Amino acid sequence: MLAVKNYKFWFCTGSQDLYGDECLANVAAHSKEIVAKLNESGKLPFEVVWKPTLITNELIRKTFNEANTDDECAGVIVWCHTFSPAKSWILGLKELRKPLLHLHTQYNEEIPYDSIDMDFMNENQAAHGDREWGHIVTRMGIERKVVVGHWSDPVVQEKQPWLLRLLPPPRPHPLSYQA
């Protein structure tokens, strides 16, 4: 009999404090909603765990080092909800030793053209933040899986079984019979 660990994947959202507390509260709420919906979909092999919004290089580095030492954390999923300066990620990315997935998505599936304003534009810059983040990761030569599309789309959710391929092989249970 094989023992399978109860792995978890951390969902880390990038932003910055430039946009203020209200925007950051919305970013956190949107991230929590995405995590809940991904877990409810039943399409992912393991639980996705929400982590507080990463807004500074110190917090990014601390979070990634915590992921490195957490035996249940099998990998990190990153999404940049707003513009998140790429230079803020460099130290954390250099030290990250877990598999990495870049979820390149937007919170809103549709752009509200009738009501769009600068607050909406500032809060929903994933297209900008994700591209800059992807650029720095590429420049650093860090391997990662990139999934592009709206997070609620079943096709996007089904692309995430890459998580299984990155896990270490299961070990036999110490009490199992081996012939």
Q: What are these language model-derived features?
A:
Residues 1-179:
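Metallocofactor- and cofactor-centric catalytic cores in central/energy metabolism, strongly enriched
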